[in-house]
From Swiss-Prot:
Its EC number is 2.7.7.72. ATP binds at S57, R60, H147, K168, Y177. It is an enzyme of class 2 (transferase). Mg(2+) binds at D69, D71, D124. It comes from Methanococcus maripaludis (strain C7 / ATCC BAA-1331). One of its GO terms (biological process) is RNA repair. It catalyses: a tRNA precursor + 2 CTP + ATP = a tRNA with a 3' CCA end + 3 diphosphate; a tRNA with a 3' CCA end + 2 CTP + ATP = a tRNA with a 3' CCACCA end + 3 diphosphate. NCBIfam families: cca_archaeal (TIGR03671). A single active site specifically recognizes both ATP and CTP and is responsible for their addition. This is CCA-adding enzyme. It holds the Pfam family tRNA_NucTransf2.
C-alpha cells in the first residue's frame, strides 16, 4: 500500500489503513456484483426511468473493509407522479433481488424503497427524480445522484480514498460517524467533502484543532461551478458547523451534526496530534465511557417505555430527547440535580435514564424573596409565605417541599399527574412506563 507522506504519523496511519482498506479482491467482487445488478435493472426497467446510477462509498472507492453496501438510484422523469415512482421503484427492486435469489423488504424514508441481501452484499434500490444542480428537489433523496456526480468529477487526478477511510474510521472510533438523529454526527458525504477541501486526513485535523462552533466552509469548486466572486454572500445557517452543499447552495451538509459532537472532533483531533495512537480509531468512545463509569455512582433511574411498532429511529430519538428535556426541567424545578442523562431505544423499548446526585432532599427548603427595599415585591412575598424573615438583604421563608424523594416524583410522572406540564410527543408517552431503580442504560 502506498505510504502517506505524514512524517511521525506515518506508521500509525498506515497500520490503520492496512486494517480498514478493502483488498483488491474485495473491490473487484463489489464491482462485478454491482455491474450485474445494474445490468439486470436496465434489462427490466423502462420509461419513466431515465437513468440508473450506483452511488455511495462503494461506488467511489471510499468504503471501509467489509462494507458491502451497494446503493442503486433509479432516476425518474420529473413529470412522473409519486404513486408511479413509488410503485415502479418497489416493483423493480423486488424483481431484481428475487432474480438473484436474495431476501428483500421495504424500508421507508420520504417514500418507500427496497432493501435486500444477496449473499454477502447489502442492497438498496431507491427511486428518485432527475434534477440538475440547484434545482428545487421533488423528493428528499433527489440530490444523492448529484452528490455522486460532483465527487467523481472532483476526484479526477486525486488519490483521496485512503484519507477518506482514515477520517471515517477516526470518527467511528469517537462514536460520531453517522448523520442519523440518534448519532447526530458526520455523514459519509460530509467526510468526503472535508477531505476534498483539505486534501488529506492529517491536513484536515491539523486545521480542525483550531475550529470553533459556527465554523463555515465553502469548497473552492463551488466558486468555479457557479462562477461566483470570492466576496459572494452565502445563505446563513444557525448550525455549529456549516459546509455548503456544492449541488444546492441553500443546504448545509453538516446540519445533522450537533455541537457536542463537533467539539469532540475538535478536542480529539488535538489529542491525536499531540499523542498519536491507534486507540482513537477503535472504539475510543466506549473506552472513555467505561473509564468514566469506574467510579462511585449517583442515584440511577430509568424509565422503560414500550416502543411503538414501525417507528424509525429518526422519529423515535428526537421524541425521546424532547420528553426527557421536558422531564429534566420538571426535576430541576423540584431541586433535584442530575449528573447526566441518556436515551436509547432497542427493538421493543425506549429507555430514558438519569444519574442523580441524590435521591432524597430535606423536607424543608429556603425560598429567597426580593430585597427588603422592593416594596411591591416584599408585600406580595409575605402574602404568599408564612414564617418569613430577613436573611442578608432579602426577605426569605422556609417552605415544605412537595417532593423530597425523586422516586415519588417519577411515580407521579408515570401516573399522569404532570400531563399538563410535561411535553408529550406522539410516540413516547411516560404514562404506564416501568421505573427501574439502580439502572442506567447506555447507548450502543
Amino acid at each position: 500500500m502506498k505510504k502517506l507522506n505524514i512524517g511521525d504519523y506515518n506508521d500509525i496511519l498506515n497500520e490503520v489503513l492496512n486494517d480498514i482498506s478493502p483488498t483488491e479482491v474485495e473491490k473487484k467482487e463489489l464491482k462485478v456484483f454491482s455491474d450485474k445488478i445494474i445490468a439486470k435493472i436496465k434489462d427490466i426497467s423502462k420509461k419513466p426511468v431515465v437513468d440508473i446510477i450506483q452511488v455511495g462509498s462503494t461506488a467511489r472507492d471510499a468504503n471501509l473493509k467489509d462494507d458491502h453496501d451497494i446503493d442503486i438510484f433509479l432516476r425518474f422523469e420529473r413529470e412522473t407522479d409519486r404513486d408511479t415512482l413509488k410503485e415502479s421503484g418497489l416493483k423493480i427492486g423486488k424483481e431484481v433481488i428475487d432474480y438473484f435469489n436474495g431476501k428483500s423488504w421495504v424500508e421507508y424514508a420520504e417514500h418507500p424503497y427496497v432493501s435486500g441481501e444477496i449473499e454477502k452484499f447489502n442492497l438498496d434500490i431507491v427511486p428518485c427524480y432527475g434534477i440538475e444542480n440547484c434545482e428545487k428537489i421533488i423528493s428528499a433523496v433527489d440530490r444523492t445522484p448529484l452528490h455522486n456526480e460532483f465527487l467523481i468529477m472532483s476526484y479526477k487526478n486525486k488519490n483521496l480514498s485512503d484519507d477518506i477511510r482514515l477520517l471515517k474510521k477516526f470518527l467511528k472510533g469517537l462514536g460520531i460517524y453517522g448523520s442519523d438523529l440518534k448519532t447526530a454526527g458526520f455523514s459519509g458525504y460530509l467526510c468526503e467533502l472535508l477531505i476534498l477541501k483539505y486534501g488529506g486526513f492529517l491536513t484536515l485535523i491539523s486545521d480542525v484543532k483550531t475550529w470553533k462552533p459556527t465554523k463555515s466552509i465553502v469548497l473552492n469548486e463551488i466558486y468555479e461551478m457557479y462562477d461566483l466572486k470570492k466576496d459572494h454572500v452565502f445563505s446563513k445557517f444557525d448550525d455549529p458547523l456549516v459546509v455548503y452543499d456544492p449541488v444546492d447552495l441553500n443546504r448545509n451538509v453538516a446540519a445533522a451534526l450537533n455541537e457536542e459532537n463537533l467539539c469532540k472532533f475538535i478536542f480529539y483531533s488535538k489529542m491525536f496530534l499531540k499523542n498519536p495512537s491507534k486507540d482513537f480509531f477503535y472504539g475510543f468512545d466506549k473506552k472513555i465511557t467505561d473509564f468514566l463509569n469506574r467510579r462511585e455512582r449517583g442515584y440511577l433511574l430509568t424509565l422503560e417505555i414500550k416502543r411503538p411498532e414501525n417507528i424509525v429511529e429518526d422519529v423515535i430519538y428526537p421524541q425521546m430527547e424532547k420528553i426527557q428535556k421536558s422531564i429534566n426541567k420538571l426535576v430541576k424545578e423540584h431541586d433535584f440535580e442530575y449528573l447526566r442523562y441518556q436515551n436509547f431505544a432497542d427493538e421493543n423499548t425506549c429507555y430514558l435514564s438519569w444519574e442523580f446526585l441524590v435521591n432524597e432532599l430535606p423536607s424543608v427548603k429556603l425560598r429567597i424573596g426580593p430585597p427588603v427595599y422592593s416594596e411591591p415585591g416584599v408585600m406580595n412575598f409575605i402574602t404568599h409565605n408564612e414564617h418569613y424573615f430577613v436573611k442578608g438583604c432579602n426577605v426569605c421563608a422556609y417552605k415544605t417541599r412537595k417532593y423530597k424523594n425523586i422516586q415519588i416524583l417519577f411515580e407521579d410522572i408515570v401516573n399522569g399527574k404532570f400531563r399538563k406540564i410535561i411535553t408529550y410527543p406522539k410516540y413516547v408517552c411516560p404514562e404506564n412506563a416501568e421505573i427501574r431503580l439502580g439502572t442506567f442504560v447506555e447507548r450502543t
